[in-house]
Amino acid sequence: MSNLFRSLASSMRALSLAAPRATAVNTTKTVVSTHQTRCLSQGLLSRHICTPMCSHNRPVAVCQSAKNGLQSKQQSRGMKVHSAIKKRCEHCKVVRRKANKRQNGYLYIICPANPRHKQRQGYR
């Protein structure tokens, strides 16, 4: 078993690109010194606060189902602005909004089936 460990250690040293061997004591000293030179706010913000919804507390199947749920939700952005707006599908509706005494308002196309069909008529 010790021969296996020695060969593994020697192969890891060979892969380390001829860097000097670091001991555990040296690495802990450098970590401690970098944490001492930070501001208090940086230290607090960089720490990971474990909550019930952390990814390492949940099983993998739950994490993947949550990711799939986020991908299936469609994000709606702004509207397309055209001088001539058209209905693109049977679900599209023409709506006139922001009308007052001095202005006729804007014509909008809204579509509950496909949010990409949202349009607003440009200035004339």
From Swiss-Prot:
Q: Pfam families this protein is in?
A: Ribosomal_L36
**SUPFAM superfamilies for the chain:** Ribosomal protein L36 (SSF57840)
Q: What is its main location?
A: mitochondrion
Q: What superkingdom heads the lineage? A: Eukaryota
What GO MF terms are annotated?
A: structural constituent of ribosome
Gene Ontology biological process: translation
The free-text function statement in the UniProt record for this protein reads: Component of the mitochondrial ribosome (mitoribosome), a dedicated translation machinery responsible for the synthesis of mitochondrial genome-encoded proteins, including at least some of the essential transmembrane subunits of the mitochondrial respiratory chain. The mitoribosomes are attached to the mitochondrial inner membrane and translation products are cotranslationally integrated into the membrane.
The family assignment reads: Belongs to the bacterial ribosomal protein bL36 family.
* Name of the protein in question: Large ribosomal subunit protein bL36m
Q: Corresponding gene?
A: rtc6
